[in-house]
């Protein structure tokens, strides 16, 4: 009986120590995690729509990245700086003009509300990308058919 309790206790300790690894365990292989979300930057050059479809196919709940806070913007800029070749001036994010009175859609491609904004310019908005010149912190208008690298979030 004592041996059974000892083994059971040992298994409980192992389980509890592993349960703290959380987010990385559930992220697809090679993806980074932050605050319960998984992120991956891809160097493939695609149009905004193709990149969105690609992200959806990569992971359950995958979309182009939705940047909802300054802290998340900093994390995404870090991921991009580490993984995207610096020869690309723009990197797709999950926001674009949906043709609603020449204003940007009020939601990200994953359906979440736009609660944080960081525009470089406030002109007509088409598709949005992060700009190299701002170290991938500022958003810039980009023609949706342009082929750019992108960041997926799941």
UniProtKB/Swiss-Prot annotation:
Tissue-level expression: Expressed by the venom gland.
Cell location: Secreted
UniProt GO MF annotations: metal ion binding; toxin activity
Cellular compartments per GO CC: extracellular region
Binding site for Ca(2+): 66, 68, 72, 153
Disulfide bonds: 27-38, 55-152, 127-144
Domain C-type lectin: 34-153
Keyword Transport (UniProt): no
Family matches, as InterPro entries: C-type_lectin-like, C-type_lectin-like/link_sf, C-type_lectin/snaclec_domain, C-type_lectin_CS, CTDL_fold
Keywords attached to this entry: Blood coagulation cascade inhibiting toxin, Disulfide bond, Hemostasis impairing toxin, Metal-binding, Secreted, Signal, Toxin
Signal peptide range in chain numbering: 1-23
Assembly and binders: Heterodimer of subunits A and B; disulfide-linked.
Function: Inhibits thrombin-induced fibrinogen clotting and factor Xa-induced prothrombin activation. Binds to thrombin and prothrombin exosites.
Family: Belongs to the snaclec family.
Name of the protein this chain belongs to: Snaclec salmorin subunit A
